[in-house]
Amino acid sequence: MSIKMKYNLGYLFDLLVVITNKDLKVRYKSSMLGYLWSVANPLLFAMIYYFIFKLVMRVQIPNYTVFLITGLFPWQWFASSATNSLFSFIANAQIIKKTVFPRSVIPLSNVMMEGLHFLCTIPVIVVFLFVYGMTPSLSWVWGIPLIAIGQVIFTFGVSIIFSTLNLFFRDLERFVSLGIMLMFYCTPILYASDMIPEKFSWIITYNPLASMILSWRDLFMNGTLNYEYISILYFTGIILTVVGLSIFNKLKYRFAEIL
């Protein structure tokens, strides 16, 4: 395989499709519901949170079901990608040892697979919009790809860092699980950002995940694109990707011996 072929965009795209397809088949092998789990899982969590926060705690947020799922569904994409990335290189150890290819495609394929699951949840959002007397906006046509690309960049940056470092520090899994749980509650998914006291507003200001969630929510519920939030998402994502690829390129030569 020539160097030119290795880094040809067409080759990389085909490789990404093949690995993503393989991961999908492995995940849903012998599964009765198959891809429906990609919708059922976040929808179940949404029902639980709706019961707790709307019916028990009586949070006063209009159209709370739509509010909840427009934050929870994109969060699920990020959280699942970040968590699964920890073992993406380990799960593909045999391919890494026996085949020469750009290994950074492996965590990227995981991000894309979870992104496909997220796309499967958009019809659910549409249904609930109609239930609450709301309608999708024409701005979705360009807004969804714009924010989705930003989330891919951001999530890939996080994933390449986690997947690389986890080969050398296996305790990282526990820290990541705790970190994701902490960030879930520090991100305005279950509550509105204006419910946070002024002295804690920095939690939103310096949290790029908040920008990501609020970007999706503004688009889905209001049909608007908040370019400030989207810019933060892209800026942070590019920084994380650059840092992640730097770590990956420095350590990738030791992958075979570690695996």
Curated annotation (Swiss-Prot):
Disulfide bonds: none annotated. GO terms for biological process: lipopolysaccharide transport; polysaccharide transport. GO terms for cellular component: plasma membrane. PROSITE patterns: ABC_TM2. Its main location: membrane. The keyword Transmembrane applies. Coiled coil: none annotated. This is O-antigen export system permease protein RfbA.
